[in-house]
């Protein structure tokens, strides 16, 4: 007859620490998938994407960007028409771009800086200058939003 392993305080402490490490690992992975999802163009999906779907979408997006870079060197294809979400600030955000930095383990981290300020200036082929009528509504300056995950 096999002996039952005795449950000791040492074993329960080890198990508790291992469980806490696993919870932390899963939390970090979920945070990294959220960062990746927010870097993708707006999606037609109505429900939350699974991890596999996020990876497939990211792979497809990287391939499209790569193909665009190859094709654009030989033609006059405009990045603004192919990838308008990058230049127009139409990124999908679950929390309206209000996020807290992730707390990752020391030595590891994810950083994502998304700002229209860092993109090249928007230049249309034939700029149209509209004639504006004076209004009494004050116009506030636009501010850039920086999202950082560490």
Swiss-Prot record:
<keyword id="KW-0805">Transcription regulation</keyword>
<dbReference type="GO" id="GO:0000977">
    <property type="term" value="F:RNA polymerase II transcription regulatory region sequence-specific DNA binding"/>
</dbReference>
<feature type="region of interest" description="Disordered">
    <location>
        <begin position="1"/>
        <end position="24"/>
    </location>
</feature>
<dbReference type="GO" id="GO:0006357">
    <property type="term" value="P:regulation of transcription by RNA polymerase II"/>
</dbReference>
<feature type="domain" description="bHLH">
    <location>
        <begin position="13"/>
        <end position="65"/>
    </location>
</feature>
<dbReference type="GO" id="GO:1903356">
    <property type="term" value="P:positive regulation of distal tip cell migration"/>
</dbReference>
<dbReference type="GO" id="GO:0010628">
    <property type="term" value="P:positive regulation of gene expression"/>
</dbReference>
<dbReference type="GO" id="GO:0000981">
    <property type="term" value="F:DNA-binding transcription factor activity, RNA polymerase II-specific"/>
</dbReference>
<dbReference type="GO" id="GO:0046983">
    <property type="term" value="F:protein dimerization activity"/>
</dbReference>
<dbReference type="InterPro" id="IPR050283">
    <property type="entry name" value="E-box_TF_Regulators"/>
</dbReference>
<keyword id="KW-0804">Transcription</keyword>
<protein>
    <recommendedName>
        <fullName>Helix-loop-helix protein hlh-12</fullName>
    </recommendedName>
</protein>
<dbReference type="GO" id="GO:0032502">
    <property type="term" value="P:developmental process"/>
</dbReference>
<feature type="compositionally biased region" description="Basic and acidic residues">
    <location>
        <begin position="11"/>
        <end position="24"/>
    </location>
</feature>
<keyword id="KW-0238">DNA-binding</keyword>
<dbReference type="GO" id="GO:0005634">
    <property type="term" value="C:nucleus"/>
</dbReference>
<feature type="region of interest" description="Basic motif">
    <location>
        <begin position="13"/>
        <end position="26"/>
    </location>
</feature>
<keyword id="KW-0539">Nucleus</keyword>
<dbReference type="Pfam" id="PF00010">
    <property type="entry name" value="HLH"/>
</dbReference>
<dbReference type="InterPro" id="IPR036638">
    <property type="entry name" value="HLH_DNA-bd_sf"/>
</dbReference>
<comment type="subunit">
    <text>Forms a heterodimer with helix-loop-helix protein hlh-2.</text>
</comment>
<feature type="region of interest" description="Helix-loop-helix motif">
    <location>
        <begin position="27"/>
        <end position="65"/>
    </location>
</feature>
<dbReference type="InterPro" id="IPR011598">
    <property type="entry name" value="bHLH_dom"/>
</dbReference>
<dbReference type="GO" id="GO:0035262">
    <property type="term" value="P:gonad morphogenesis"/>
</dbReference>
<comment type="function">
    <text>Transcription factor which binds the E box motif 5'-GCAGGTG-3'. Involved in migration of the gonadal leader cells; distal tip cells (DTCs) in hermaphrodites, and linker cells in males. Positively regulates expression of alpha integrin ina-1 and ADAMTS protease gon-1.</text>
</comment>
């Amino acid at each position: 007859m096999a002996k039952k392993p005795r449950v000791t305080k040492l074993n329960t402490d080890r198990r508790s620490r291992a469980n806490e490490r696993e919870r932390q690992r899963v939390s970090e992975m979920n945070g990294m998938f959220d960062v990746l999802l927010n870097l993708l163009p707006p999606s037609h999906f109505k429900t939350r994407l699974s991890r596999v779907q996020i990876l497939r979408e990211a792979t497809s997006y990287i391939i499209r960007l790569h193909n665009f870079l190859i094709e654009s060197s030989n033609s006059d294809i405009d990045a603004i028409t192919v990838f308008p979400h990058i230049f127009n600030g139409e990124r999908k955000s679950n929390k309206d771009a209000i996020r807290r930095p992730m707390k990752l383990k020391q030595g590891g981290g994810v950083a994502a800086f998304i700002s229209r300020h860092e993109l090249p200036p928007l230049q249309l082929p034939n700029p149209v200058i509209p004639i504006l009528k004076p209004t009494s509504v004050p116009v506030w300056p636009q501010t850039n939003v920086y999202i950082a995950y560490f």
